[in-house]
Amino acid sequence: MTKRELYLFNPDNDLSLASGEVNYMPPATARRMAEELALLPAWYASAGSAVLAPSAYNLAFLREMQECLSLPVELVTEPEVASISNLKPVPWGWNPALKRRLRCLGMPETELPAEPYLEKLRHLSHRSQAVELLPRLQLDESFCGESFYLTQPEEWCRFVESRASCLLKAPLSGSGKGLNWCKGAYTAFIAGWCKRVAALQGGIIAEPVYNKVIDFAMEFFSDGVGKVVFVGYSIFSTNASGAYDGNLLLPDEEIERRLSAYVPKVSFVSL
């Protein structure tokens, strides 16, 4: 039987993956975002697939959008999951809590990731992986940056107090969460924060603070069996604390033009 993809948007994935708990409850803001943006996958889902929404209240908006744009997807509500036999879940991200949620909705175990897969995913999502990869991404003089994975209290203290300013990060976090901005003093608050994060996630990511001029990301797609392809750029904004504020919706050509004001196009294209 041909599987039908069921897309779902779970913006709490980073937080849930960091927790690792099957009963993890996201904060109210994340739950509200997931509910209000439940139909977001309709904009990137493959033709003929379905999008999971909390209830049929989302259907009116989807129908309105389909009158104006080509969005060849259908809505599936949570109560309907158990009655549709050929669904294959395609979430924003996998984590133990989502696996439990889908199982409770009636998704067959064969369509859910095994525990070793989730453990490997958590390991690969850990920022210590980026620390190891960063030096290999610096292809020419246009690139810079350093990042450290520190596991001992004396390392945290030494790093903070040896710089006028620096940034400490929880290894499993996203969207500007799990950040601690330091001003050269290893205070009791910072020490306590580091100890709590390291107890849960193994250590702390420590980085210098740079004179940033623009936030952008390169987006890639992995098919899960070894093939990775570049799918586009993302230019976004953050607030003074580093938390995500929003995105600019621009074609890749325009983003490349803007980035070229700071870095030669040949450099980031080669990356």
Residue ranges and their predicted role:
Residues 30-39, 127-132, 187-193, 259-271:
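Well-ordered, non-membrane alpha-helical segments in soluble/globular domains
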Residues 140-145, 167, 183-211, 270:
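Conserved ATP-binding module of the ATP-grasp superfamily
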Residues 220-271:
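ATP-dependent carboxylate/phosphate-activation module, predominantly the ATP-grasp catalytic core
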Residues 1-43:
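N-terminal-proximal low-complexity accessory segments that begin disordered
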Residues 134, 159-181, 200-212:
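ATP-grasp fold ATP-binding core
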Residues 146-147, 166-190, 217, 239-256:
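Glycine-rich phosphate-binding loop of ATP-grasp-fold ATP-dependent ligases
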Residues 30-44, 51-158:
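Conserved N-proximal alpha/beta basic substrate-recognition cap immediately N-terminal to
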Residues 190-242:
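Phosphate-binding site of ATP-dependent enzymes
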